[in-house]
């Protein structure tokens, strides 16, 4: 069900499917060329269109870049923390998006995701209430690899 919803969401936006792997999908945008693994939360406390993605932008030399869309807007100065197993990463964030502060952190996050079972993104909502979006990581390694291959052969 999650995979089907992911496919419909992404196909509706003109993306080319590269495969669906458990709760993660891999897709390619033709112009500008970029490929990504993407998933919706397995559990979320908000109501928005939350997702986590790991993107490759070949023309920009970007590989394995994390992007999180939060399920609700966060409080202006609230920290956003990504947890994978016992690893914790503080993310940079906008009102409803978060990302790693640098490529080294992206690399560490992706390595943790490949070995993890689940990850959660925690912060405070605009009203001050804590919330978390939780993602199952089964299939993430294969989806990331499929996205990398999808852009490598183009």
Regions found by a protein language model. Give the residues of each.
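Hydrophobic h-region of N-terminal signal peptides that target proteins for export
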Residues: 2-13
């Amino acid at each position: 069900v999650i995979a089907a919803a992911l496919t419909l969401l992404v196909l509706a936006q003109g993306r080319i499917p590269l495969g669906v792997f458990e709760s993660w999908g891999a897709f390619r945008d033709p112009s500008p060329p970029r490929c990504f693994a993407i998933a919706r939360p397995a559990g979320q406390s908000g109501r928005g269109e939350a997702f986590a993605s790991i993107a490759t932008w070949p023309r920009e030399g970007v590989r394995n870049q994390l992007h999180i869309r939060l399920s609700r807007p966060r409080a202006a100065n609230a920290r956003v923390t990504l947890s994978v197993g016992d690893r914790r990463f503080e993310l940079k964030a906008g009102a409803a998006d978060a990302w790693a502060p640098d490529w080294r952190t992206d690399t560490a996050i992706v390595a943790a995701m490949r070995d993890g079972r689940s990850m959660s993104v925690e912060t405070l909502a605009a009203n001050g209430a804590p919330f978390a979006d939780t993602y199952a990581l089964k299939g993430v390694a294969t989806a990331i690899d499929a996205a990398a291959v999808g852009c490598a052969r183009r």
